[in-house]
């Protein structure tokens, strides 16, 4: 009996994860072979030139909603007094957000007094009415923080790896514009290209002026060494203690030293089989200097920015596979949006900080929030590798489809357990999974995807697959809860629609819906039919009316004509419409002629072809969705 139980348990577990001889574990439908970057793509076509990427960066920085900073053009003098006041107000707002559900490195919830101490430290005691900004360079992997304090802010005392202080990771040699300092002098208020927050002062070197600052990080392509691996460490050295074991994370860009004599010792070593780079150093007085360091040619680094190809995107993304997830850049790692930023930084592309801000970037994108399921499937089948997919609070890189499954790679905090989707499972790693994984609301990731964005195509390029003519109408009707999919969330666009369904849609469009007392066994459409009958929306000439019968195009025209008059809309628009221009005009029933004139004249229904209206044909769900959207547009105009 015990043996049977053990076997049953093993069989149960095998449905939850895959385990291979290597000892690595995978989520369902993920195999060991899929962990290789080359499994997904080997395409080496250059997707964008360096010049195109530079132009795109300018557009991203200037686009409304991306919250990016043009660092070179920030004000050089600010009002420090006013800034102190603004910082205090914003910090009070932040404290109000966190108060009541967070902890300060203890089992006791943080109090208002705890936050007041942090807020007090935001005030620069040396603030001036006219205050020059400072120009800093990060000398070690660090972060921007919510408050100027090392104290961690947790939402769970048992989960000290997730610290809400972290806003974004800052790479070695990354520039920041400094606008203020904390009361204790241990933090600077700073901006990097995508965020603002408090940076530890001991992680920043202050340049002598703006010109020196720009020269440190504005590196020409041929003079740059780019770290494309998740983490690269400089070698240990007693002689070179300033750079010994220095961590360089994905997307770090350093300047290559020129005119190097390989016999010249760098930290007690010759330069053979190494790159020689300049590394920023913070002097004892906090000022900037630089020193040479060696990086092995076998490290995951690249001379110049990498060429933007699908093969290289995959290579970079997979260098972080299995590594730690770090909220806001914590744990010297990154979260989902930070991970995507780091990947594309290796190609000199600057993405916005978070999922919301990235959605405003001027790139090829498609809003899938209200896309019907079958259309979504068709759309996914044509998605290019490297597309960034979004739903509320998460983003991921699309890899491809296999055996009807869609695969993504992302830095993941939690998912619902595949074998028990009511239980939340902490992941905290960069992983591969299918879009069959579920969220806490019971929907799959596939169901929840709201946006697809291709970073390597401009906004005017046809980078994403085209979607069907009825997408706008379907999206409108789903969004406004006029229509819905079936129990499996399929929209069924080609299915013919019935009288009952159309009447229910019109009923759904009413802002104030009359309630009727109905029998327990009344059909689902009973209220809508009764409402339509009371308001004389069913034409008396439709003697064959049956709620479950399919509605013809001329019946639909008559229904919308009567509904427009019921709502008080102007129906005179169709009085001059010459429907005799259609070859099958005499097939239109006499009672429906005014309605067909109105609905065709208003552009709500169009001919099946240039010369026919097919009045006796049935109407599909896709057609009615578009008709409703056009009808609402007519009403608005």
List the predicted regions and their residue ranges.
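Bacterial N-terminal signal peptides
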Residues: 8-18
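Glycine-rich catalytic cores of cysteine/serine-nucleophile enzymes that process amide/ester linkages
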Residues: 231, 236-293, 323-334, 390-438
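Feature responds to low-complexity, polar/acidic, surface-exposed segments characteristic
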Residues: 460-471, 479-554, 562-592, 606-618, ...
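Active-site nucleophilic cysteine motif
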Residues: 317, 327-358, 499, 503, ...
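...with weaker cross-activation on analogous glycine-rich loops/strands in unrelated enzymes
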Residues: 169, 351-419
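Aromatic- and glycine-rich peptidoglycan recognition patches
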Residues: 22-38, 194, 202-226, 230-234, ...
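Boundary regions of SH3-family modules and the immediately adjacent low-complexity/disordered segments
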Residues: 22-145, 151-156, 161, 171, ...
């Amino acid at each position: 009996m015990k043996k049977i139980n053990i076997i049953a348990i093993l069989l149960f577990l095998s449905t939850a994860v895959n385990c291979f001889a290597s000892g690595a574990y995978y989520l369902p439908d993920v195999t060991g072979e899929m962990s290789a970057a080359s499994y997904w793509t080997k395409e080496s076509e250059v997707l964008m030139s360096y010049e195109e990427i530079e132009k795109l960066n300018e557009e991203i920085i200037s686009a409304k909603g991306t919250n990016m900073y043009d660092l070179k053009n920030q004000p050089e003098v600010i009002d420090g007094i006013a800034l102190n006041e603004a910082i205090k107000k914003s910090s009070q707002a932040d404290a109000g957000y966190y108060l009541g559900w967070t902890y300060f490195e203890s089992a006791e919830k943080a109090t208002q007094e705890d936050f007041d101490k942090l807020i007090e430290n935001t005030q620069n005691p040396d603030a001036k009415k006219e205050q020059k900004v400072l120009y800093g360079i990060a000398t070690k992997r660090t972060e921007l923080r919510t408050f100027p304090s090392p104290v961690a802010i947790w939402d769970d005392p048992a989960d000290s790896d997730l610290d809400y202080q972290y806003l974004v990771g800052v790479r070695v040699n990354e520039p920041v514009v400094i606008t203020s300092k904390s009361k204790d002098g241990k933090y600077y208020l700073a901006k990097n290209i995508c965020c603002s927050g408090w940076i530890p002062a001991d992680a920043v070197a202050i340049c002598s002026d703006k010109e020196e600052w720009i020269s440190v990080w504005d590196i020409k392509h041929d003079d740059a060494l780019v770290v494309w691996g998740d983490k690269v460490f400089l070698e240990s050295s007693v002689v070179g203690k300033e750079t010994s074991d220095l961590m360089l994370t994905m997307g770090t860009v350093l300047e290559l030293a020129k005119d190097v004599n390989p016999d010249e010792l760098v930290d007690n070593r010759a330069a053979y089989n190494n790159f020689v780079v300049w590394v920023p150093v913070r002097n004892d007085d906090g000022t900037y200097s630089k020193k040479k360091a060696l990086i092995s040619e076998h490290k995951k680094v690249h001379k110049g920015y990498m060429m933007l190809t699908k093969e290289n995107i995959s290579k970079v993304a997979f260098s972080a596979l299995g590594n730690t997830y770090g909220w806001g850049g914590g744990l010297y790692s990154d979260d989902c949006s930070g991970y995507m930023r780091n990947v594309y930084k290796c190609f000199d592309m600057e993405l916005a900080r978070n999922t919301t801000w990235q959605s405003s970037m001027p790139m090829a994108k498609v809003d899938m929030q209200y896309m019907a399921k079958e259309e979504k499937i068709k759309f996914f089948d044509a998605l290019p590798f490297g597309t960034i997919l979004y739903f509320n609070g998460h983003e991921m890189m699309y890899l491809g489809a296999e055996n009807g499954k869609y695969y993504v790679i992302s830095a993941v905090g939690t998912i619902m357990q595949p074998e028990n989707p009511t239980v939340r499972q902490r992941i905290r790693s960069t992983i591969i999974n299918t879009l069959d994984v579920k969220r806490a609301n019971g929907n799959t990731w596939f169901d929840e995807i709201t946006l697809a964005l291709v970073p390597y195509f401009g906004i005017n390029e046809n980078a994403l697959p085209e979607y069907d003519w009825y997408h706008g109408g379907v999206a409108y009707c789903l969004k406004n809860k006029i229509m819905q999919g079936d129990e499996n969330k399929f929209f069924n666009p080609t299915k013919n629609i019935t009288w009952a369904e159309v009447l229910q849609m019109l009923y759904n469009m009413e802002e104030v819906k009359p309630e009727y007392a109905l029998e327990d066994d009344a059909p689902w459409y009973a209220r809508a039919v009764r409402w339509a009958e009371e308001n004389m929306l069913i034409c008396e000439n439709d003697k064959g009316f049956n709620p479950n019968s399919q509605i013809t195009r001329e019946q639909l025209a008559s229904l919308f004509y009567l509904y427009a008059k019921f709502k008080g809309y102007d129906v005179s628009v169709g009085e001059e419409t010459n429907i005799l221009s259609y070859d099958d005009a005499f097939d239109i029933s006499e009672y429906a002629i005014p309605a067909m004139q109105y609905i065709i004249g208003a552009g709500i229904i169009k001919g099946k072809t240039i010369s026919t209206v097919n009045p006796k044909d049935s109407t599909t769900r896709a057609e009615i969705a578009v008709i409703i959207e056009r009808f609402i547009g007519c009403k608005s105009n």
